[in-house]
């Protein structure tokens, strides 16, 4: 009862958990865009969140899939569980809010009008939704600067059924450096790369000035140290010598990366767009080496519960 009262006060009903990202069936979900005149399109390798307030998804579509002006008025995104072609775990009804041309195709921007989540029994899910509404209602009082709406919190939780790998992003310009964790990143099937960084982040100015980014995969074993970097991210610059994790320089740009990181990726920024609460960096990969290994990722708690009820599982690093 005490736990329930605590939940009701804080409103934290839609939870997320850090997990170990793995090459396994539990992470091999399919994401399908439906409602287009050309028929359903598998966009599993072509989507990324680009804003949190409002919650906006970017979906890359090839020119052959969308004729100019032919985008359906009410498309929807479906997330399918491993080895299933029939019933989606979640369905997000989309509302088109824009389009950004890319080197290959275009990035279509969508807000989420409605969310259906099948990971939990309906009574349990509606209790979680009630708590999410309470969380949104008290956001200003709690000092939550992002203040996502209850609708967007529901959409975000369903979208994170597809785990988001975490990277340490290294940036620098004019003797200022920063290193911070991000999961709003996405490698597209076209070879292009997206990163969405909160507009208030000091890292935005550094990236805009240098047009360069270095990324290293965040090891699951360094969970606490990775989150500590996130807590220090508001500082104007970061003293890399005082960090508790070993840091080295990326081979191409000389930007800070995790020493002996499994994967190091270096990007050149080609375009910058401000979308809602975030700044979207559209980039190309200049250099990549290594493998991710046991990488930290974030996953929806509702999907973790679904896996457990289905006698499946993944390595969860913190209690739900």
Language model features with spans:
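Basic, polyanion-binding surface patches
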Residues: 1-320
């Amino acid at each position: 009862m005490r736990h329930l009262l605590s939940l009701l006060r804080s409103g934290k009903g839609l939870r997320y958990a850090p997990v170990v990202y793995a090459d396994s069936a539990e992470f091999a979900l399919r994401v399908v865009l439906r409602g287009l005149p050309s028929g359903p399109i598998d966009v599993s390798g072509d989507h990324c969140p680009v804003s949190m307030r409002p919650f906006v998804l970017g979906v890359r579509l090839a020119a052959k899939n969308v004729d100019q002006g032919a985008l359906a008025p009410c498309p929807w995104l479906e997330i399918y569980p491993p080895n299933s072609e029939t019933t989606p775990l979640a369905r997000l009804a989309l509302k088109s809010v824009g389009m950004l041309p890319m080197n290959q195709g275009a990035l279509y921007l969508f807000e989420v009008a409605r969310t259906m989540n099948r990971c939990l029994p309906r009574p349990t899910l509606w209790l979680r939704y009630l708590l999410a509404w309470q969380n949104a209602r008290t956001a200003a009082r709690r000092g939550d600067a992002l203040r996502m709406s209850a609708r967007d919190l529901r959409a975000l939780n369903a979208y994170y059924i597809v785990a988001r790998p975490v990277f340490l992003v290294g940036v620098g310009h004019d003797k200022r450096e920063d290193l911070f964790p991000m999961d709003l990143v996405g490698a597209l099937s076209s070879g292009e790369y997206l990163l969405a960084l909160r507009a208030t982040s000091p890292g935005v100015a550094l990236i805009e000035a240098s047009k360069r980014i270095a990324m290293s995969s965040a090891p699951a074993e360094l969970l606490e140290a990775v989150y500590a970097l996130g807590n220090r991210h508001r500082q104007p610059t970061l003293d890399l010598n005082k960090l508790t994790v070993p840091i080295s320089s990326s081979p191409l740009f000389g930007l800070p990366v995790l020493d002996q990181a499994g994967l190091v990726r270096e990007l050149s920024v080609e375009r910058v767009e401000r979308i809602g609460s975030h700044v979207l960096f559209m980039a190309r990969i200049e250099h990549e080496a290594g493998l991710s290994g046991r990488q930290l990722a974030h996953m929806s708690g509702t999907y973790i519960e679904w896996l457990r009820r289905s006698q499946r599982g993944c390595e969860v690093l913190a209690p739900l």
